[in-house]
Regions:
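Donor-binding/catalytic cores of nucleotide-activated saccharide
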Residues: 1-113, 118-136
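C-terminal subregions of glycosyltransferases and related glycan-biosynthesis enzymes
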Residues: 121-169
Length: 169
């Protein structure tokens, strides 16, 4: 976590609390740090999401292919997570995809802060996102994908057409 960005996030959240404003999902940017290449890539949402205001799914724009809402960018209200009954299979990698996907329809209000809060370091051998490691764990990825697919009937359970479109990819 970036210290200055975390301080900004906490200040924003305190402001919501002081004004008695409910925000179900706080969204921020994240940065991929490719350690061995010495490069980094920031993933932000400033053209897809409204900034500096509370918004709903019906106010979102279109996401580019590289703008997925991943665990690194999402901070849910605790009661939203509890109500989601996240099905987390034990001893399984890639469950962060369940965390990033299943609670979304329960989020009625969101806030996007254009801050680089989380830095994700990639490139270590044996890391779960390493290509060779992913191939060995395809069964786990399939298990997670099936859980995500079975979590909703997108046309029956997801009210917002814009959220549905995002969730369908």
């Amino acid at each position: 976590l970036d210290g200055a960005a975390l301080s900004t996030m906490l200040s924003i959240l305190r402001g919501f609390e002081e004004r008695d404003q409910r925000v179900d999902l706080f969204i921020s940017n994240y940065v991929y740090e490719k350690v061995y290449e010495g490069t980094h890539t920031a993933i932000g949402y400033k053209f897809a999401l409204p900034r500096k205001k509370i918004f709903t799914w019906d106010q979102i724009g279109h996401f580019r292919l590289d703008q997925n809402l991943l665990m690194h960018s999402l901070c849910y209200r605790t009661d939203v997570l509890r109500a989601s009954n996240l099905p987390m299979p034990p001893h399984t990698f890639y469950v962060d995809n369940i965390y990033a996907y299943v609670p979304l329809p329960r989020c009625k209000t969101m806030y996007y802060a254009d801050i680089d809060l989380y830095r994700y370091f990639i490139g270590r051998e044996g890391q779960s996102v390493n290509e060779a490691t992913m191939v060995k764990r395809l069964d786990q990825q399939f298990r997670v994908t099936r859980i995500m697919m079975e979590s909703f009937h997108l046309y029956g359970d997801v009210e917002s057409s814009r959220l549905r479109s995002y969730m369908m990819g």
